[in-house]
A protein has these predicted regions:
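Short, leucine-enriched amphipathic alpha-helices that occur as contiguous helical runs
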Residues: 18, 98, 109-110
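Short loop-to-helix capping motifs
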Residues: 31-32, 50, 155
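DNA-recognition helix of helix-turn-helix
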Residues: 130-162
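Short amphipathic alpha helix immediately N-terminal
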Residues: 105-125, 129
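A short, charge-rich alpha-helical start-of-domain segment used by transcription regulators
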Residues: 1-23, 34
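Short, Lys/Arg-enriched anionic-surface-contact patches
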Residues: 94-105
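Σ70-family region 2.3-2.4 aromatic/basic alpha-helix that recognizes the −10 promoter
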Residues: 18, 26, 37-91, 141
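Hydrophobic topogenic segments
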Residues: 156-182
Length: 182
């Protein structure tokens, strides 16, 4: 009888991490559905092959995002957001002003902001995702937060997104950083 334990483990790994990794990819790649799906799929396949070693859910999630971020550096991400990208991000609760602010940031800044403030990973996991030390990751997240706020226009703030959405977290981070102005 064949041993399906490796295949079963990889399937469970994909089931556990697939949706959230795809969401990370969608925001990181500014709503580019095709690129996000391709990168998330490749990352799940490659990193998932080592699923037995990645038993701790947060460490596995950080390892997946680190791999996806490295792969995304080679992806062409449009800085000018299309209507389709804006619609995709709106579906995640990220309004046009927030999307434009994210679009003006570097991939690394977006990864820092998403992992530290939206997904709320611990500092060590953010360091893994960014491929740096914990103190450097802490500084990178603070810099990304500051850059996001600087680029988010005060007069064109998004309507509050549905509670629990990624967009709610983006707006909450903005509000904390701006002292309640967002």
């Amino acid at each position: 009888m064949p041993d399906h334990s490796d295949a079963d483990l990889r399937a469970a790994f994909r089931e556990l991490h697939g949706r959230s990794l795809h969401g990370f990819a969608l925001v990181l790649l500014l709503g580019d559905r095709a690129a996000a799906a391709a990168l998330a799929g490749t990352t799940l396949e490659v990193v998932g092959a080592d699923a037995a070693r990645l038993r701790h859910p947060e460490r596995a999630a950080a390892a997946l995002r680190a791999d996806l971020r490295r792969r995304a550096r080679r992806a062409r991400v449009a800085r000018r957001l299309s209507d389709g990208q804006l619609a995709t991000l709106a579906g995640l609760g990220i309004g046009a002003a927030s999307a434009r602010a994210l679009g003006s940031m570097t991939l690394r800044d977006r990864a820092a902001l998403i992992s530290a403030d939206i997904e709320r990973f611990g500092e060590d996991d953010v360091a893994t995702i960014l491929g740096t030390s914990t103190p450097q990751a802490r500084r990178a997240a603070a810099t990304a937060r500051r850059r996001y706020v600087e680029r988010h226009p005060d007069g064109d703030l998004d309507a509050p997104p549905a509670p629990g959405s990624i967009g709610a977290r983006v707006v909450a981070v903005s509000q904390r950083t701006m002292g309640g102005r967002a």
